[in-house]
UniProtKB/Swiss-Prot annotation:
Organism for this UniProt entry: Salmonella phage S16 (Salmonella phage vB_SenM-S16)
Annotated catalysed reactions: 3',3'-cUAMP + H2O = U[3'-5']pAp[3'] + H(+); 3',3',3'-c-tri-AMP + H2O = A[3'-5']pA[3'-5']pAp[3'] + H(+); 3',3',3'-cAAG + H2O = G[3'-5']pA[3'-5']pAp[3'] + H(+); 3',3',3'-cAAG + H2O = A[3'-5']pG[3'-5']pAp[3'] + H(+)
Pfam families: Acb1 (PF23474)
Family named by the database record: Belongs to the anti-CBASS protein Acb1 family.
MF annotations from Gene Ontology: hydrolase activity
GO terms under biological process: symbiont-mediated suppression of host innate immune response
InterPro entries, per database record: Acb1-like_C
Name of protein: Anti-CBASS protein Acb1
Catalytic residues (UniProt): H44, T46, H113, T115
Its biological purpose: Counteracts the host CBASS antiviral defense system. Phosphodiesterase that enables metal-independent hydrolysis of the host cyclic di- and trinucleotide CBASS signals such as 3'3'-cGAMP, 3'3'cUA, and 3'3'3'-cAAA. Does not cleave cGG or cA4. Besides evasion of the CBASS system, might also enable evasion of the type III CRISPR systems that use cA3 signals.
Sites where the protein binds 3',3'-cUAMP: Y12, E141, W147
Binding site for 3',3'-cGAMP: Y12, E141, W147
Keywords for this protein: Host-virus interaction, Hydrolase, Inhibition of host innate immune response by virus, Viral immunoevasion
Amino acid sequence: MMKFQDFSSGLYVAAKFSDSTLDEIENLQRELKVPNPVPRHKIHSTICYSRVNVPYVVSTGSFEVANSGELQVWDTQDGRTLVLVLDSDYLKFRHNYARALGATHDFDDYSPHITLSYNVGPAQFSGIVQVPVILDREYKEPLKINWTEDLK
């Protein structure tokens, strides 16, 4: 049973991907000559970034969660971020599961994605990419508000 103080720490949940998916993502980063690529060991998809902790149970199993994505550049407070937006009913379902438990979300909607670079500068990217995205596992940890410090 969760105690009151457990709810104040926040919750972060993410999906990690199979080695074959990581190989595909790294190949994509190289082919596109992505500036400042996210390193292999940090490639993930955020499922839940909640300012309150909830009793989320991570999923187990390895299976395809998407087979394509759309390249988009998002303007963020940290710069121009290149993402591969995934059409994944599974990741949306897991996000909605967290929300049903009471998790918060800072944006109007949830767009499952894999960040390819947190800083692409003026470079432009767009298009649909065929890539099998295979879940390896989910993990959860206390929310780190200053997570961008880990990127340095």
